[in-house]
């Protein structure tokens, strides 16, 4: 399993999800990506994207800054 970090801070909807989708294409099944995003819409968009595409949202937590950290495992 490989873990990668995708920094989407400063990007507004829908760019964090679009970056995540593009990044997932280059990952192997079982790999985990940590997405950092500070757009409030990402709190809804990233979990919804994972649910709709069959990926696993492992965790979603606020960081020390105003960003939120999302851990996503590629399943398909």
Residue ranges and their predicted role:
Residues 1-3, 30-34, 67-69:
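Intrinsic-disorder/low-complexity, polar/charged segments enriched in Ser/Thr/Lys/Arg/Asp/Glu/Gln
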Residues 6, 21-24, 45, 63, ...:
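Residue-level detector of intrinsically disordered/flexible regions characterized by low predicted structural confidence
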Residues 1-27:
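An N-terminal amphipathic alpha-helical segment
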Residues 7, 36, 71-73:
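Generic structural detector for well-ordered beta-strands
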Residues 47-76:
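C-terminal structural segments of small proteins and small subunits
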Residues 19-56:
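Amphipathic, hydrophobic secondary-structure cores in small proteins
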